[in-house]
C-alpha cells in the first residue's frame, strides 16, 4: 500500500491510536456513531477547537470512518473555490450535502466523518415509489492512499459520491455496512436514505419504495461496496468515479426545492463565516489545510486532463434528457413512463390505474434516460425505426394520391360538365312541358270564352225575340175590337207561358259566368323540387358539395331538434331498453308459478267469451271477479246486490290501500273519507289527461263508498231482465246475452280495473322532435291532427294557423298549403287529417263552423270538398284500403262512411257504446276500431254498425288519445295518462306488450304510425315527437 503524501497525524503525534474492529458480536447501538474502543484523545479535540471554536459536527449525526487502522483527524476542513483561501466550519461542511456538484468544493469531515454527499439539483431521476431511489453509489475511497490525502480525494473530485457509503459503517477488516434502519442487525446494507440517515437492507428499500410514510425520502443505492470494503483500489481516473455516472438521481420536485433551499442556506452560512474576524490558526491546522489544497489541486488537474472534453458533453446530454422528460397532461405531477401498445399512447401510473388496466392493455416501461440499458435502448430504437418506416410508407401513399390529383380533377370536371348538360336538358324539358301546359290551358280558356260569348249572343237573340213577341201580344190585345171580357179567357191562358219565358230569360241573364285561373304557387314549388331532380355527391368534406342543404332549398336550418343522444346513443338506449325488459321479465318470472293456474283459466274464459264480444276484457272480468270474491258468480247465487258488491268493494278498497302508499308515499287508513281526501290532493298532473275529470279515481272511490255506478248497472239489468234482487233467489228471469254484455261493459268501466295500470311497461325514448310555437314554417299554434303517408312524410293539421304542413320522416319542413277562408283551397280550423295510401291524397276534416271534408292531392292542390250539410262534429277520420272515408263524430256519437266523391255509403249511431270518441282506424275485414277517451278502451264495430268487442280498459289504457294498426296487423292504443303510453294488442284483444315514455307529456292531440316501427305524437307543447316502440314478448297483468 502506497504511503500517503501527507504525513499522518498519528505519526506526527508519535503513536498510533488504533481502534478495535467496528463489527463484533455485540452490536452496541443502532446509531452509526457508536464505536467500540478508545475515544479520540484530548489533543485532537483541542486541535479542532483551537482554530474553530464553536464548530460542530458536519452532520447532525456524525459518523466515524476507520482508514488503515488509524483514527482520522477530528477537524473539519472546507476548501473554497480557490485552493489558497479556505475556511473550516461544521456548518459549511453540513451545507455541502446540498450544494451543487463542482470540482472546487471539498472538505474534511470532523469528528470521524468524511465529507458529506454533494447532491446536484440537476441530477433528477424518476421516482419509483414513496422513497426516491437514487442511482448506484460507488465508493470513492482509494485503497492505495491513506491519511489526509485519502480523505481529501473523495471530496476534491467534486463528485456526488460519499465515503460514508464505504467507510462510515465499515470495520477495519473490510466487512460491508449493515442495515441500521430495521431490527435485524445482520442484514447487509444495499442503499442509504439521506432523510433517515440510515443504511437500508433490501426489505427497507422495498418499504421506502411503497410506503406512504417514506414519501419524499432520498434513497441512494450502493453499488460496488464489496470492492471498496475488500480494499480493491479504484483508480481516480476510472469511469466508475466519473461524476456523471455516480450522481444521485432524484425525480421528486419537493426534493429539488429542498436542495435549492439548502444551497441558499449554505451560501448564507459561508458568507457569515467569511465575515467573522479571522482567528489565529495553529501550525497543525495550517499544515493540514496546505496538504488538502495541494491534493485537491492535483486531483482536479488530473480529472480535467482526462474528462475535460467529455464532461461538458455529458452535462449537455443530461440537460437534454431532462428537457425530454414529459409529464402527463391529466396528472401534472406524473411522468409519462409507460407506453400502452393497445392504445398507442404514453401513460403515467395514474392513467394505468384509471384507464389502462394491466389485464386489458399491453403495457411496457419506457425507461428514463438515466436508467436506460443497452437492451432497452436497442428495443426503443427498433420501435422508433419501425414507426418511422410506417410513417414513410403512409407519406408515400399520400404522395401517390396527390400525384393523381390531376386525373381526379379531370374526372370531376367531366362529371360536372355532364351534370350541367343534364340539368340544362331537364330545364328545357320542364320548359317544354310548361309551354305545352300553357298552350293547353290557353286553348281551354279560349274555348270557354268563345262558348260564353256564343251563349251570350244566343241569349240576347232569344231575349229580343221574347221581347218582340211580348210587345206584339200586348199591342194585339189593345187593338182587338172585341170586348175585354171576351179576351180575358185567352189572356189567362197565355199568361202562364209568358211568365215562364220571362222568368227563364231573367235567370239566364243573372247566371254568373266567371273565368279564373287557379294556381297554387307553394304546390308548384314543392312539385318542382320533388320532380326536377337533385344533385347527388358522395363528398364528405366541408366544401360546397359536402354542405347539407335543407329540403326547402334556402339553406336555413330546419325547425328540428333532437335529444342530446346521437344516433349511437339512441341505439345504446334501445339496448338499454332491452336490458330493462329482461329485468322485467325476470321479475315476472318469480310470479309465474303463482299465477299459472289463474292465467290458464283466464285463457279458457277468454276463448269462451269471444262469442259475446268480450275478448280480453271479459276474461279479465271473470278472473278479477273470482279473485275479488265471486261477484259474477253471485248472479246465480242470489247475493248480487249485497254480498257480491260488498266483496268487490272490499277487494278494491284493499287494493287501493296498497296502491296509495306506493304512489303518494302517505299512509292509507281504509276509511272512505281518508281515501277521498288522499286522492283529492294527490299529484295535480293526474288531471292533465284528455277528457279527465277532477275525480280521477271516481270509479274506485265510488266502489269504496258504495256509489251508484254499480247500482246503475244493476238497475239497467233489472229494467231489461226483471228484478234481480227479488227474483234471483226464486229463479228470477233469464238475463239475455245482450243485457249481460251491456252489464259487463258498465261493470268493466266502473270498478274492475285499478286507476293505475298494473302491467309492467317497457321504457322508450323519442329519437326526434321538432316544432315550436309560431306562424312561420315548421311552427304550430295547435297541431291537433297528424298522419303519415306511404313515403313516411308527416302531415300535420295546424288548426289555428288554418293550414296543413308536410315534413319528412326526419322532421324537416317540406311545404305547406291552405289559408284562412271558406273558398276552395282555403281551410278553416282543420283538426284531423288522413291519407289515401294508393294515391297520396290528403283528407282534411274541419271543425265548426264549416264541419266539412276537403280533399287535396299529394302536392296540396285542391280537389273537392263535401259533407258540410251532413257532418256536425267530426272528430276522427281514416281511409280504408278501398279508398272509403270513415268519419267518427263526437257528441252525436255517429259514424259516417263516404266515398271519394262525397256520397254517403253507410251511417249508423253508437251512442249506447261510445262516450267520447277521438280516434278511428280500420282493418281489411271492414272492422272499425274507435278509441273512446272516457271509456278508457277501444270499441270495435263493423260497417253495418254492429258492436263486436272491446279492447283494453281502465287500468290498462287510461284516457286513450288515439288508435292505430301497424303493418303486422297489431292494434296500438296510445294514451298520455301520467306518461305517454303505448299498449299493443292483437285484433282479438290479447295484450302483447306495453311501453311508456321516460318523460312526461302534457295533453296530447293525436298519434300516427310510421312504417319503420315508430309513432308520431302531436303534443300541446307545440311539438311533435317520434318514438320508436319495441316489440316485446307478451306480458301478464
Curated annotation (Swiss-Prot):
Annotated organism of origin: Drosophila melanogaster (Fruit fly)
Biased composition (Basic residues): 579-598
Described purpose of this protein according to its UniProt entry: A NHL-domain family protein that functions as a translational repressor to inhibit cell proliferation. Plays a central role in translation repression of hb mRNA by being recruited by nanos (nos) and pum to the Nanos Response Element (NRE), a 16 bp sequence in the hb mRNA 3'-UTR. Probably recruited by other proteins to repress translation of other mRNAs in other tissues. Negatively regulates expression of Myc in a 3'-UTR dependent manner in both neural progenitor and epithelial cells. Regulates expression of mei-P26, possibly at transcriptional level.
InterPro entries referenced in this protein's UniProt entry, alphabetically: 6-blade_b-propeller_TolB-like, NHL_repeat, TRIM-NHL_E3_ligases, Znf_B-box
Domain of life per record: Eukaryota
Keyword line: Cytoplasm, Metal-binding, Repeat, Repressor, Translation regulation, Zinc, Zinc-finger
Observed effect of gene inactivation: In larval brain, results in deregulated cell cycle and defective differentiation of immature intermediate neuroblast progenitors ultimately leading to overgrowth and proliferation. RNAi-mediated knockdown in the larval brain results in overproliferation of type II neuroblast cells on the dorsal side of the larval brains but had no effect in the type I neuroblast lineage in the ventral nerve cord. Conditional RNAi-mediated knockdown in type II neuroblast stem cells results in the same phenotype.
Subcellular location: Cytoplasm; Cytoplasm, Cell cortex
Domain-related comment: The NHL repeats form six-bladed beta-propeller that mediate the interaction with the pumilio repeats of pum, and are essential for translational effector function.
One GO cellular component, as annotated: cytosol
NHL repeats mapped onto the chain: 767-810, 814-859, 860-901, 902-944, 945-988
Summary of the tissues where the protein is detected: Expressed during embryogenesis, mainly in nervous tissues. Expressed in the embryonic central and peripheral nervous systems including the embryonic brain. In third instar larva it is expressed in the larval central nervous system including the brain and the ventral ganglion, in two glands (the ring gland and the salivary gland, and in parts of the foregut) the gastric caeca and the proventriculus.
Subunit structure, as described in the record: Interacts with nanos (nos) and pum. Acts via the formation of a quaternary complex composed of pum, nanos, brat and the 3'-UTR mRNA of hb. Not recruited by nanos and pum to cyclin B 3'-UTR mRNA. Might interact with mira; the interaction seems to be important for brat localization during mitosis. Interacts with Ago1.
Protein name in UniProt: Protein brain tumor
UniProt-listed PROSITE patterns: NHL (PS51125), ZF_BBOX (PS50119)
Miscellaneous comment text of the record: The neuroblast overproliferation phenotype of brat knockout mutants is used as a well characterized brain tumor model. Early stages of tumorigenesis can be investigated because the tumor initiating cells of the type II neural stem cell lineage are known.
Binding site for Zn(2+) 1: 179, 182, 204, 208
Region (Disordered): 29-63, 159-178, 543-606
Low complexity: compositionally biased ranges: 159-175, 565-577
